[in-house]
Amino acid sequence: NEGIAPETEAILSAAARAQLVEELIKPALYDHNIVVADRFMDSTIAYQGFGRGLDLMFLQELNYLCTGGLKPDLTLLLEITPLMAQKRKKKDKPDRLEKEGIDFQEKVRQGYLHLARENGERIKVISAGETREKVIKQAMQHINSLITERWGN
């Protein structure tokens, strides 16, 4: 739905996240597995909070409710300007959020960067403007550091 209200978008995202947490994430963590997700609670703050202008405190409480307080141990933020991202993706058809335009994407980007500044111990920023090899190397360094910190060599 292209004309979805920001509040509805936030609540639907939270509902999907709550289901994901209950069905997949909690059981995996209970079985001592490492869980990797491509988006999680920070996306709500960046997209609905910074992008759509919804109240950040409301969104934080919504995140807490739908995740049961679970937070990622590590978040890798692949940082790129909206213009560069758009140029890279020019072959693909834009999704609903990409159709919002550069101004919206920049608000979301600034939201993610704000979260990274506020949560530097958890959110690691990687320049996605670098080569694929450099991005992968940086990501693996952060992942390996966390594994070493938690479980040793």
Predicted regions and their residues:
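A glycine- and Lys/Arg-enriched "phosphate-lid" helix/loop adjacent to the NTP-binding pocket
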Residues: 39, 44-110
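NTP-dependent small-molecule kinase module
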Residues: 83-153
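Short aromatic/hydrophobic contact patches that present stacked aromatics
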Residues: 10-12, 77, 96, 125
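ATP-dependent small-molecule kinase phosphotransfer cores
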Residues: 1-67
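Hydrophobic/aromatic beta-strand patches that form the interior of the parallel beta-sheet core
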Residues: 36, 74-76, 124-126
